[in-house]
């Protein structure tokens, strides 16, 4: 993205990776650079410009593909593994902004994705509060703010939290789960 506002900024890179339920990556994924709209690169803020310069992405803008072509390729890639609409969640780290950009600029892709998201940053924040030992030992990230590297690091991070924070096995029995649910009362205001 050239910034965080989908009304004035644009997508400049998109990637996707499909995993199975155990977070095993099924193939190398897809990673595309999108040619920015005229004027958006010049209008980028200093922070974003430095980030895209340091990562090398800014040097790839001119050879990027059209936004519609990028949407079609990503959608084709996802449908190869998940042909049914509304079943594939968007997943990654701090993906609220990603979802807004996809909704605005890639409506067919947005329509194919499930409305629910899997945001690793939520798990990270809960772990920081409830399981700080696990949080502070989490794998360090160094994706350099490139889409595919960020996705792969998010998958590794989610694998880590799954093993270090979430209950191993199938979880509580139905009876235990029901007893837990019955024991939790929300304070009334």
Map each language-model feature to its residues.
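Short, well-ordered beta-to-alpha junction loops that form the rim of enzyme active sites
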Residues: 91-96
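Conserved non-catalytic scaffold segment of RNase H-like nuclease domains
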Residues: 1-90, 139, 187-189
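Acidic two-metal-ion nuclease catalytic site recognized across multiple nuclease folds
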Residues: 141, 145-189
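Acidic active-site catalytic centers that drive phospho-/nucleotidyl reactions
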Residues: 13, 20, 98, 119, ...
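Substrate-recognition/cap helix-loop segment adjacent to the acidic, metal-dependent catalytic center
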Residues: 80-82, 97-116
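Active-site-proximal helix-loop-helix substrate-binding element of RNase H-like nuclease domains
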Residues: 35-40, 47-48, 120-152
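Catalytic phosphate/metal-binding cores of nucleic-acid and nucleotide-processing enzymes, i.e., regions
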Residues: 21, 103, 125-130, 174-177, ...
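Short conserved catalytic/interaction loops centered on acidic-Pro-aromatic/His motifs
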Residues: 110-114, 134-138, 166-171
């Amino acid at each position: 993205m050239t910034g965080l506002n989908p009304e004035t900024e644009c997508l400049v890179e998109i990637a996707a990776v499909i995993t199975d339920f155990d977070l095993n990556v099924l193939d190398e994924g897809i990673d595309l650079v999108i040619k920015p709209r005229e004027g958006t690169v010049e209008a980028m803020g200093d922070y974003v410009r430095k980030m895209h310069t340091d990562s090398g992405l800014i040097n790839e803008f001119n050879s990027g593909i059209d936004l519609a072509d990028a949407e079609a390729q990503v959608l084709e890639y996802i449908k190869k593994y998940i042909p049914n609409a509304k079943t594939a969640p968007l997943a990654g780290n701090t993906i609220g902004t990603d979802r807004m950009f996809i909704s605005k600029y890639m409506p067919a892709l947005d329509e194919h994705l499930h409305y629910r998201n899997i945001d690793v940053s939520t798990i990270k924040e809960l772990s920081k509060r409830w399981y700080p030992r696990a949080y502070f030992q989490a794998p360090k990230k160094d994706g350099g703010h490139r889409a595919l590297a960020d996705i792969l690091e998010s998958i590794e991070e989610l694998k880590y939290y799954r093993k270090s924070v979430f209950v191993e096995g199938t979880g509580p029995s139905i009876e235990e789960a029901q007893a837990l649910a019955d024991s939790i009362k929300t304070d009334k205001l």
